[in-house]
């Protein structure tokens, strides 16, 4: 996901983009949960001696990122929000089957909530609702590799556990709102307007929670870095540089 932006970002920041446990090249955890993922990434950051940091929030990475941010808010230099949900009011109709599963975790509801865990559903992460001319810029190798990884031992179970566990993240939305209200971290939004999974209205909730948030809406889908990596990297570089300068000004004052 970050392959195209890491070279640019490394000009001004030390970039750490690990695969979450059970994703990519990372091993599967025996006990799968977003807090467990947060602890694993926190241990990695401590091992690397990382202090203050910018945190990228996207989809399943948002619960992990907030776990890290809320454990040590003084370390957060800024948030970069890219198609991530943190507000109860912004769940669209596409979440109905998942919410039904959270309320009534029957086998039937689980099957409906996880029906997208197929090759076609994996492809939809990239292409669903995306205009054809934009979708044409994404090579099929991307979702083919994702599907290969999902089919490895333990990976499908990881996906199912996270879908169920996302309800516990949703239950933390009030605490997240309190964190944002108290700390008001410098924030940059990069949002693909054609996302089939996260409602565009969520952008308003973010900006209401963070009135000084810088927001940019792209003609892209859920995985906007696949099609708009260059402008996204430029915006992130500018955001980090300005945040660094403001931090220096506060120190001098």
Q: Which residue stretches match the model-derived regions?
A:
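Flexible "cap/lid" subdomain of the alpha/beta-hydrolase fold that forms the substrate-access gate
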Residues: 16, 23-56, 60-216, 238
């Amino acid at each position: 996901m970050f392959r195209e932006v890491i070279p640019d970002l490394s000009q001004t920041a030390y970039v750490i983009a690990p695969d979450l446990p059970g994703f990519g090249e990372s091993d599967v955890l025996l006990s799968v949960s977003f807090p467990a993922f947060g602890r694993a990434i926190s241990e990695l950051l401590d091992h690397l001696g990382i202090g203050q940091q910018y945190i990228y929030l996207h989809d399943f990475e948002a619960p992990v990122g907030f776990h890290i941010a809320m454990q040590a808010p003084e370390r957060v230099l800024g948030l970069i929000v890219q198609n991530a949900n943190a507000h109860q009011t912004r769940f669209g109709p596409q979440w109905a089957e998942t919410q039904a599963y959270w309320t009534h975790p029957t086998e039937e509801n689980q099957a409906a909530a996880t029906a997208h865990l197929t090759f076609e559903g994996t492809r939809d992460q990239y292409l669903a609702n995306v205009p054809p001319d934009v979708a044409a810029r994404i090579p099929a190798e991307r979702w083919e590799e994702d599907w290969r990884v999902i089919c490895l031992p333990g990976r499908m179970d990881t996906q199912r556990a996270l879908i169920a566990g996302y309800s516990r993240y949703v239950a933390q939305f009030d605490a997240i709102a309190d964190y944002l209200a108290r700390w008001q971290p410098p924030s940059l939004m990069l949002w693909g307007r054609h996302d089939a999974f996260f409602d565009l209205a969520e952008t308003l909730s973010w900006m209401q929670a963070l009135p000084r948030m810088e927001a940019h809406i792209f003609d892209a889908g859920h995985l906007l870095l696949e099609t708009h990596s260059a402008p996204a990297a430029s915006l992130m570089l500018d955001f980090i540089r300005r945040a660094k300068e403001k931090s220096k000004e506060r120190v001098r004052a």
